[in-house]
Structure formats: structure tokens, C-alpha cells
């Protein structure tokens, strides 16, 4: 059986430009400002964010092949749930695990380890699909197979520098 742990923003959802556009550089790590943006984003996420090209087709193919998949995202589930339902993405995934629920950000492997455990899979059986270089590195260092997906909004360096076993420019 194949197990996949997907990131959402920048990997399946074309949302990173919006997230980064919502902050000035000095606000990016301000907790209060992050909460304000999350609340605003919940209202707009399903309206303005689209799936990345090829996302639905890839998920449909993997699902039809019997893959077992989940979401492991820094974005709180309550923010992205309307988007997931609008585009029917929720039907492909066993569960949605966010960093708040996991108790740590993606600079620590907790979310990936908990996702594998909830899938009933070993680390060696799971593939993590990520756009973020630091998240890909975290998963890689924890022993996961990693596929890095390039998103120009999150990759200040070439996606070939991701700590990934494979990289792709898109999901098509």
C-alpha cells in the first residue's frame, strides 16, 4: 500500500502568494498579526484560492490506485476546510492534521510522525509531498521519502535545493 502525507498551501492549493502578500516582512512572525490574517483568510480562502494545476487529477489517480493519503498542514483546518469541501479535496484524505493539533511547527517532525502513525504506516512506507524547503528538510531528516513541489512563492532558492528524493515543477 502507498501512503502519502500532503502539505496543502503551495503544494495542493495555489495560496502562498496570498499568504505572503498579507504580511509586511516585519509582521511575518508576529503571532497576533498571524491570527488576524487567519481570520480574514477563513472568509476568503474558498473564494479566491484555487487548487494548483494538476492537483485534482493527481489526487484522483493516486486515490484510484489505492493510495492512502492525509493532509499535514501549517494552516489550521478551520481556515482551509471550506476550500477543501468546495473543490472536493476532502474526499481523498483520511484526515487533516494541522500544526496546532500536532503541537509543533514543521521545523520539528512531530506533524509528519503523527500523520504516519494515524495512517497506520511506518516512516519508510510514507511519502511526504511538500513545497517548502525547510519542511521538506524536516521530513527528510526524520527518514521520510520526500517529493518537493516547486512554488515560486515559497522557494527563494531553486527547488532543486530541496532536501527531497524527487522534485517536480508542478503536479501535472
Report the location of each language-model feature:
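Active-site neighborhood of HAD-like aspartate-dependent phosphohydrolases
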Residues: 1-27
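Helix-loop "lid/cap" segments that line or gate small-molecule binding pockets
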Residues: 24-28, 32, 36, 83, ...
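Short, basic/glycine-rich phosphate-binding loops at helix/coil junctions
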Residues: 33-41, 96
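Short, acidic loop-to-helix structural element flanking the phosphoryl-transfer center
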Residues: 44-71, 77, 81
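Substrate-recognition "cap/lid" segment bordering the active-site pocket of phosphatases
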Residues: 70, 76-127, 133, 137, ...
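Acidic, Mg2+-coordinating phosphoryl-transfer loop and its flanking beta/alpha structural elements
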Residues: 128-159
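Conserved small/polar residues in nucleotide/adenosyl-binding loops
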Residues: 160-167
Amino acid at each position: 500500500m502507498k501512503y502519502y502525507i500532503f502539505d496543502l498551501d503551495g503544494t495542493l492549493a495555489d495560496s502562498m502568494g496570498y499568504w505572503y502578500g498579507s504580511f509586511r516582512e516585519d509582521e511575518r512572525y508576529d503571532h497576533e498579526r498571524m491570527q488576524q490574517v487567519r481570520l480574514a483568510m477563513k472568509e476568503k480562502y474558498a473564494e479566491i484560492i484555487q487548487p494548483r494545476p494538476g492537483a485534482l487529477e493527481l489526487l484522483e489517480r493516486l486515490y484510484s490506485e489505492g493510495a492512502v493519503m492525509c493532509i499535514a498542514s501549517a494552516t489550521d483546518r478551520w481556515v482551509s476546510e471550506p476550500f477543501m469541501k468546495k473543490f472536493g479535496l476532502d474526499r481523498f484524505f483520511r484526515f487533516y492534521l494541522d500544526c496546532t493539533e500536532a503541537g509543533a511547527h514543521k521545523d520539528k517532525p512531530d506533524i509528519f510522525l503523527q500523520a504516519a502513525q494515524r495512517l497506520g504506516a511506518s516512516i519508510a512506507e510514507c511519502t511526504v509531498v511538500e513545497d517548502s524547503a525547510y519542511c521538506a528538510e524536516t521530513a527528510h531528516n526524520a527518514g521520510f521519502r520526500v517529493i518537493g513541489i516547486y512554488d515560486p512563492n515559497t522557494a527563494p532558492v531553486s527547488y532543486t535545493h530541496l532536501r527531497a528524493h524527487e522534485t517536480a515543477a508542478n503536479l501535472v
